[in-house]
Each structure stands twice: as structure tokens, then as C-alpha cells.
């Protein structure tokens, strides 16, 4: 087996407003002696979609052929990859154990493709959002969380307001605790 070009570490996190709404992802990468931060958001998403998106972005950004360790506080993401849930989904035609379509299939397919780009990908579950945790990877996870929350807050919210015989479209942009209508 060829030696990896280098070892890379990725701290990933996702954030969303409720079960559906604006969301963001945050990624902190360390490899080649450098640190790279990436974040982004979507208007109508879930926390789970943002968690998986963050892992996809991490693996797609890191040069091919690496040994990568992904640190995430998402049991959904880490358990799927470490326990091989996706293997059953593939065998069952992307149906879960209830014979229902697997949620977020598009992202799982993207993640599996991104994983194949690397020599080895290791998945590590970390405790998230703990003010007392002294784990060595807490700083990376906390920073990924900050990036995800900031991206979520910067993602505009769109509403359609219908009035009898008149249609008005308004845009509400959320900035921290302040809202502005235009």
C-alpha cells in the first residue's frame, strides 16, 4: 500500500433552525501544516443535512489520497459510517429498515463518493457543545460549531405573504437577534 501524501484532520458541524429552516455547516481542516476554515448555509434544511454536508465538503476539499480523520459530534453521521448503515441501504435499494426511502440519500451518495477519494477515512465521535469538556479535539469542534451557527444566521429567510386581491413578497433577513424587513 502506498504511503499517504499526508495525514489530514477535519472537524465538522452543522446547525439549523428547528426541523426545517435556515441552516449552516462549519468545517475546520488541518493538513500540510495549515488550517483552513469553510462554512456555508442553505435556506430550507435540517441539522442532519448540514452535518453530512460538512463532512462532504471536508473530504472534497482535502487533496486525494490522504489518510483523513473526521471529528464530528453527530451520532447520525458517525454511526452511519462506522457501523456501516449505508451498506444495508445500498443492499436494500436505498430503503431503511422500515422499507422507507433513506433520508438525505443525495448527500449520503455524495459522501460515499468523497470517501473513495482517500486512502483511509476514520470517523471519530466527539462530545459537542460542552463547556466543561477537556477533550483534545474540543477546540476544533467548537470552532466548527461557531462557523456553522454563523453561516446559519447569515442565511436569509424568505416568506411569501398573500393578501386578498394583492400579493406582496417580503424578505426577512436574520442578523443575530435583529431582523430587518425590506
Regions of interest found by a model, annotated:
Residues 12-22, 37, 56-140:
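RNase H catalytic domain
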Amino acid at each position: 500500500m502506498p504511503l499517504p501524501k499526508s495525514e489530514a484532520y477535519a472537524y465538522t458541524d452543522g446547525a439549523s433552525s428547528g426541523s426545517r429552516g435556515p441552516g449552516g455547516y462549519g468545517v475546520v481542516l488541518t493538513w500540510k501544516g495549515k488550517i483552513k476554515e469553510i462554512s456555508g448555509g442553505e435556506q430550507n434544511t435540517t441539522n442532519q443535512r448540514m452535518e453530512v454536508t460538512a463532512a462532504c465538503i471536508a473530504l472534497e476539499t482535502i487533496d486525494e489520497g490522504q489518510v483523513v480523520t473526521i471529528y464530528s459530534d453527530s451520532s447520525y453521521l458517525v454511526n452511519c459510517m462506522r457501523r456501516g448503515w449505508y451498506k444495508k441501504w445500498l443492499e436494500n435499494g436505498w430503503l431503511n429498515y422500515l422499507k422507507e426511502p433513506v433520508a438525505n440519500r443525495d448527500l449520503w451518495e455524495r459522501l460515499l463518493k468523497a470517501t473513495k477519494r482517500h486512502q483511509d477515512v476514520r470517523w471519530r465521535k466527539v462530545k459537542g457543545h460542552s463547556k466543561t469538556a477537556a477533550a483534545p479535539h474540543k477546540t476544533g469542534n467548537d470552532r466548527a460549531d461557531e462557523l456553522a451557527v454563523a453561516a446559519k444566521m447569515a442565511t436569509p429567510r424568505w416568506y411569501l405573504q398573500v393578501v386578498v386581491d394583492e400579493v406582496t413578497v417580503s424578505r426577512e433577513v436574520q442578523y443575530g437577534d435583529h431582523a430587518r424587513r425590506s
